[in-house]
A protein has these predicted regions:
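Multi-pass alpha-helical transmembrane bundles in non-GPCR membrane proteins
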Residues: 1-238
């Protein structure tokens, strides 16, 4: 079995030194670790290129509010990819436990930031704006919980992540967001990937489980990025 949440928390209370991950049965094989490393390297490269491209395009062609939204989204994107890599690849020690808090917090930031890119358009209605405000409030509470109560609300957090992600259905149903159908399909594809991929997140006995889960998440992020890019592009040309 992998190191549990309680084991990592106990190490965080013992002192600042890092120990061999194998000492507490963090038994990912070398091949599994390399696979996870490769996926995170690809993810970081993708994030840097994607964020850079989005920001350059927004700065050259989009209105001010869209530039702000693109900047917030890029911050969320890079935060998720960076903290995921740092947390998952760091040796088991107190530092890893702290990185775990930021890893979980970054997910809330990215979800709220993603929908910000769709609602800043001047055509967005009151309901859509209220949904966005609600998402940011939930994100703020989630970040506070992840930082102050690490490891105690993990199952609830997963449900909150999924619920926030599928809030796109609300935005689409109220018809108050000028969301192109292609962008909507990309968001649905991303949500479906993460939701279905949760089986890999909890299937700890599966070899390469961690790498497979992170690959699924990366594919979902790519779908959501494509949706954001398409919306920013369409708004820049209107």
């Amino acid at each position: 079995m992998r190191a549990s949440t309680n084991e990592i928390r106990e190490m965080a209370l013992q002192g600042p030194s890092c120990r061999d991950p194998g000492a507490i049965d963090w038994n990912y094989t070398r091949a599994e670790t390399i696979a996870d490393l490769a996926i995170h390297v690809v993810g970081l490269c993708f994030g840097l290129i994607a964020a850079g491209s989005l920001l350059v395009h927004a700065a050259l062609h989009a209105p001010t509010m869209n530039i702000v939204a693109a900047s917030i989204y890029s911050l969320g994107l890079l935060s998720v990819l960076t903290f995921s890599a740092a947390y998952n690849l760091w040796p088991v020690c107190p530092v890893k436990w702290w990185l775990r808090r930021f890893d979980q917090s970054a997910i809330y930031l990215l979800i709220a930031a993603t929908y910000t890119a769709f609602v800043v358009d001047k055509k967005a209605g009151t309901t859509a704006v209220c949904v966005l405000i609600g998402l940011w409030c939930i994100a703020a509470l989630g970040i506070a919980a992840a930082l102050a109560l690490p490891g105690r609300l993990d199952r609830l957090a997963i449900g909150v992540y999924v619920g926030m992600g599928w809030s796109v259905g609300v935005l689409w149903s109220v018809k108050e967001v000028p969301l192109p159908f292609g962008a909507f399909l990309l968001l649905v594809a991303g949500g479906a990937l993460v939701t279905a991929g949760l089986i890999f997140h909890v299937w700890h006995g599966l070899r390469f489980q961690n790498a497979i889960w992170h690959l699924v998440v990366l594919l979902a992020i790519a779908c959501q990025y494509a949706a954001v890019l398409s919306v920013v592009t369409s708004q820049a040309t209107t």
